[in-house]
Amino acid sequence: MFKRILVAYKFTPASRKALEKGIELANDNGARLHIFHALDYRLKSLDESAPELIEISEETKLRFQTEAESLLKGFNNVTFGCLPADPALETCKIARLDKTDLIILGSHQIPEQSYISRVDYVGMTILEKAPCPVMLIPQ
């Protein structure tokens, strides 16, 4: 059913749940999984060869590897990318260019009201502009 799945990742518990679901669906469907993390938009003014941007990108990739290694458990049809960008618009752009079948997002729950989940501005923008279905995963 799905051949290309994109997880918008923010290093939060909600994003971790979204990643878990993305891995599960990619495994079940034999799909390729791409995880995207938007770096601070203000870094966009730097040249891509700027030492500061290279260092932040490498640190982010290492952090992802460290946090996700236990979840991936041998699943290797996965890529991770990060760059300075508007998180919502870049997620939709990646989905469009890659012909993504499904975008997966985490939604945050209010601790006192676990039956209520919320989606922030980035999530709402993705829901409005996505070129494919979007799946929301509660925390």
Describe the function of each predicted region.
Residues K3-S49:
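Small/aliphatic-rich secondary-structure junction motif
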Residues E52-R63:
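A short acidic, glycine-rich active-site loop
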Residues L72-I103:
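Structural beta-alpha unit
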